[in-house]
Structures are given as C-alpha cells and as structure tokens.
C-alpha cells in the first residue's frame, strides 16, 4: 500500500446562504458554499408557491402589444 496518496479528511462547517443553517460534515475540501438547503427549499418545506418565470417569447409578445396600441 502506498503512503500519502489519500486525501486528508477534515471537519467542515457548511452554512446555507438563504436561511443561515449550518451543517457539520467531514470533507477533503476547505470550503463549500450552498445557496439553498433542505431546511429552506420549497420542495422539502411544503411551500407550493411557484413564481412563473417569464420567458423571452412572453416578453416579446408584451412589447409587441404595447407598440400596436
């Protein structure tokens, strides 16, 4: 078996940037940044309010209707 080829595992604290919940894990990385976690994600919390994202075609149709009026 070769020595010193394995990654060094260290304790790491991950903090969600949305709800500021922190998780303690063991990882070979120095830092991990997450935007959303299971504590604040709508799928896990049961929040079913979905914001409809307006697409490029919808934006174009609105501009076209304004110009025609």
From Swiss-Prot:
Pfam families: Ribosomal_L31. It comes from the Bacteria. The keyword Cell cycle does not apply. One of its GO terms (molecular function) is structural constituent of ribosome. Keywords: Ribonucleoprotein, Ribosomal protein, RNA-binding, rRNA-binding. One of its GO terms (cellular component) is ribonucleoprotein complex. One of its GO terms (biological process) is translation. SUPFAM superfamilies: L28p-like (SSF143800). Part of the 50S ribosomal subunit. Binds the 23S rRNA. Belongs to the bacterial ribosomal protein bL31 family. Type A subfamily. This is Large ribosomal subunit protein bL31.
């Amino acid at each position: 078996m070769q020595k010193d080829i394995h990654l060094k595992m260290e304790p790491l604290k991950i903090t969600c940037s949305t709800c500021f919940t922190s998780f303690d894990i063991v990882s070979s990385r120095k830092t991990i940044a997450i935007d959303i976690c299971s504590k604040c994600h709508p799928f896990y919390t049961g929040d079913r309010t979905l914001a409809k994202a307006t697409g490029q075609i919808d934006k174009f149709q609105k501009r076209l209707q304004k110009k025609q009026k």
